[in-house]
């Protein structure tokens, strides 16, 4: 905008100073054909630029409102994401969650191994479908992750605390079900042998919107995890001061 303003100012300045000083000081320049022409040109340019800037500002505002109000498939409001050192046991996770929930600002907390919304998924697993290998995004979570993030299970059941005692269980999104023709109770490769599909959840956007939907699997590792969560997703009460919650 600054460069545009400078360029627009250069020509009128050069054009006006090209006239004899006597003509300008006597006031005849304004009424002259050249004066009328340059005045009309400047008014026209100012009008066009002002209109263009207003349109651009409105477009940016509409785009911002669209992105803020777009249904991502999960409840993104009142969520704090905290990267932390990996826990060493489920008991440590439970103790940390209980401590958080002592504060009335905090409703619940879920945990996962990495960022939920990211353009680069850290883990992708492979599934054989129609004699072809197809990949899907793989995300290891705590048993209450879908509940805390507001992701609806549309078929089967959600994870439960008892799933931490099993050898791993899956919940896929609807996009994965469509792509791979998956079924409830179907068993796929897990980290510790075969793991069943216990449910399917509503589609959601785990990447920025320009990437579209992807086949996605939530996974509770069960009794013998190879790793523990490194990210906490903390749901706070509506109206909570985020700084106060983070300080806690």
Where are the predicted features?
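Short extracytoplasmic
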Residues: 80-103
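Glycine-/small-residue-rich active-site loops that bind phosphorylated ligands and cofactors
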Residues: 33, 88-89, 177, 241
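Alpha-helical transmembrane segments of integral membrane proteins
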Residues: 1-87
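Residue-level signal for transmembrane alpha-helical positions in Major Facilitator Superfamily
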Residues: 7-8, 56, 92, 138, ...
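Active-site oxyanion-binding pockets that recognize sulfate/phosphate
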Residues: 51, 90-93, 239
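Short, conserved clusters of charged catalytic residues that mark active-site
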Residues: 36, 40, 91-95, 244
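Mid-to-C-terminal secondary-structure elements
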Residues: 95-248
């Amino acid at each position: 905008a600054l460069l545009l303003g400078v360029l627009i100012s250069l020509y009128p300045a050069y054009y006006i100073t090209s006239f004899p000083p006597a003509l300008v000081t006597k006031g005849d320049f304004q009424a002259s054909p050249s004066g009328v022409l340059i005045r009309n040109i400047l008014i026209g340019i100012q009008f066009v630029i002002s209109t263009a800037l207003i349109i651009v500002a409105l477009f940016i505002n509409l785009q911002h409102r669209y992105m803020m109000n777009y249904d991502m498939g999960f409840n993104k409001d009142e969520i704090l994401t905290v990267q932390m050192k990996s826990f060493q046991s489920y008991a440590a996770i439970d103790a940390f969650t209980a401590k958080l929930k002592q504060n009335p600002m905090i409703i619940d907390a879920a945990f996962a191994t990495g960022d939920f919304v990211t353009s680069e998924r850290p883990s992708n697993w492979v599934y054989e479908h129609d004699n072809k290998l197809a990949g899907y995004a793989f995300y290891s979570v705590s048993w209450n992750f879908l509940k805390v993030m507001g992701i609806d299970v549309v078929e089967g059941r959600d994870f439960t605390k008892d799933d931490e005692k099993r050898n791993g269980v899956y919940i896929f999104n609807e996009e994965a079900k469509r792509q791979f023709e998956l079924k409830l109770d179907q068993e796929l490769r897990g980290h510790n042998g075969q793991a069943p599909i216990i449910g399917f959840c509503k589609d959601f956007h785990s990447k920025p919107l320009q990437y579209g939907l992807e086949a996605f699997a939530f996974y509770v590792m069960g009794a013998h995890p190879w790793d523990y969560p490194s990210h906490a997703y903390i749901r706070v009460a509506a109206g909570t001061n985020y700084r106060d919650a983070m300080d806690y």
